[in-house]
């Protein structure tokens, strides 16, 4: 048997391990062997039964009993299964005949009915189709690949089992009396079991070979000092004591030697890593991409290599830095983007600390101090507890710090590029590194701050936005950012006003807190220093100083103007914007500052000087700041009120665009004032200047005075109490004699109406307290009661005799533009969001609305359109005063169907008189809503004069020779139709019946006249006859009524 087994092994070695041929041969042997095995098993059973018969009677009695019990239980189980099967067949519509057909059929037998085969045959028989499918599946698995790689030890380990099986077979064959036939049968069975065991062993050996390949990949890096990992700085190292020596210079030689040795270790570790990766499929794929791939593919391959192990891929790092330094902008920007992703968002740089140079490692000095010798050279034992891993890590960290600095230098170059896109991308890269990592933050912050002075406003605004975003992410950097902006922009000579304006605009949006009063104090100091610098340079008042800074010789230095768009006027506007930004910053910083009152009082004089600048809007902001200081700190209160009182007469107030801001300032100042006489003087002057302003400002002032009456009820004395003269007594009159001497006569007890100058109102006083406004009356309110704007009249009458609480007026509702917009009937604009990019913007919109007396223009956009049905259906008492005319017009003739019919008929009857008819309708409605608009004593003579005026215009023009008398009559008689409208409203039914004939007559009259030449027009009489006027008027009125 050993020779046969060796022959089978030699035969199997030359064959595939588990292919289709082997499987077919295997299944064939199974088919041949199974019948012999069955006969053998049957013979054994017969011999066993014969031997059992020769034993004791007890043995012969028990076995039949157990067999009978087994047969009975098997029959009972079979009957139960047949009953269940019969129930299922009946449920499906069958009967007992169907049960007989399938009763003895095995569930695995597809050949039809018939008695079931023995159990051994049913379990081990294979269908031919299944064998074919199994052979194809085994061939697709590719197990034959592992035949050549099979380890011989596996067969050696399996040989004892085979020997055991063979010995057992020999023993059984020797004891068997069947001889050679049974021996051959057993040999065939052994061959089947051997083949089956070999297949199993080879499959197992293939799986065992796959697992060591994974472990082998980990074993490749056993020779490395530092394991490959993306976060190299998180590699576990033994902790070393850190110390700072008093004299680090004595260790310089040892540090230099250790650094050289560490660099050699890093090179060796990198070489080992590269050799371990040389034959990997990933490395081959990377090499293919680097040799034949596109630029983006190369950058991606380099990035992936660095991400696997930054410490062992310095060469890939250098390649990316080289690409970032190319002159090609596309390559450089793409490489810089990859580097920023690695260094900013990736794990290459530590998040919680900066990189240290090799000589700056604290643990290095601790190790050198613990060593016996002060000088270390290569070949000696490492000092202290230093290991090679420490040295490799420190050497790479030193190299990475230098490489990172080179990247920042490249970013600085691209931040100054000529192309705007390159500068914008480089700016974003700088922000990405500065936001995510603390390494080189001072240099990165300097680059970002310097872009506030970029020649393109878009880039400068972008830099300002990124700085604010940086402060939101890192609030602890406020002091650093403010100091850098001051040093690099505000105090740096040669910076333009536009750059300083952008810088101040960035600083005044810094989020302040009561927990950081030093930040607010620092900002206040910067703001006031800028105020003084602007005042000394004369930029605010001297236009000539805007041309440039003066040199020592006195000649102005030319400023660079890259865009060529900035002129002297533009620079002056920028200066005013700069002052406005400074005032905004002071307003926001004062509530959080802890500056002493003496320091603020020194700067108040600067603010008062700004109130007299050329821009009135800037003066308003300065007054707002002074008012805040005067209220909270009680500084220069009287001077503030004098300046505010004087600003009411400033002619620039009429054209200012900050009326709402100014009225709010007046309201807060008056409400916080404790002197009623001063408040009355302000009210008196406010009423006096209203005749110079537009209705919007007038309505705001009247509403402001009505609100002040709630705080100061004594203001009613200006309206209710008459003026009285303060006389010291009765005046004494003396007669003059003829000789010129005075004779004493009796005093006459007549009260004089003369008011002494000491008690009379004097509006020219600088101090409002001394103007004696409290002794006068508001006579200036009388013209406002009959103001041409209806809203002004309503507010004035309500102020004189309060009857109802009027809503807060919106200045934008009473402007001329808003009035004209009502005739356009356009859709309202979308509401603008109040929250912008700055977190400081919503303060005015949300928190400050409770103190605003007059709102902004936002509500004007939300007013409903006058040509909408919701406006037509309003009751007359619900309509605002300025909208009464529109409501009357659309209520009477604003229905769409009626207007269309009237226009069609008017076009048909009067031709081009459609536009004139519409104007007459509008004028009619206007006079209806306000009768006094036409004026008193309107008679026919005035109409005739108006007709003559129109006639003379036509005569001078000479181009309009078709001006028919009917059209002239319509224009001149439009006023008369208004007066007759009320009387004709009751007779509309009769007028409609007579309209067709009169219209025809009017049309015929117009057609008979035709076109008149200029000479014929001159010969026409000035006045027409009464009959002609009657016909024309009848035709006109009937046509309009239709």
Curated annotation (Swiss-Prot):
The keyword Nucleus applies. It is found in: Nucleus, Nucleolus. This is Ribosome biogenesis protein NOC1. It comes from Chaetomium thermophilum (strain DSM 1495 / CBS 144.50 / IMI 039719). Belongs to the CBF/MAK21 family. Residues 1-20, 28-79, 101-128, 148-214, 546-567, 897-1020 are annotated as: Disordered. Required for 60S ribosomal subunit synthesis. The keyword Nucleus applies. GO terms for biological process: ribosome biogenesis. Residues 118-128 have a biased composition (Polar residues). Residues 153-164, 173-194, 937-957, 978-994 have a biased composition (Acidic residues). It comes from the Eukaryota. Interacts with NOC2. Forms a nucleolar complex with NOC2 that binds to 90S and 66S pre-ribosomes. It holds the Pfam family CBF. GO terms for cellular component: nucleolus. Keywords: Nucleus, Ribosome biogenesis. Residues 9-18, 63-79, 195-207, 902-911 have a biased composition (Basic and acidic residues).
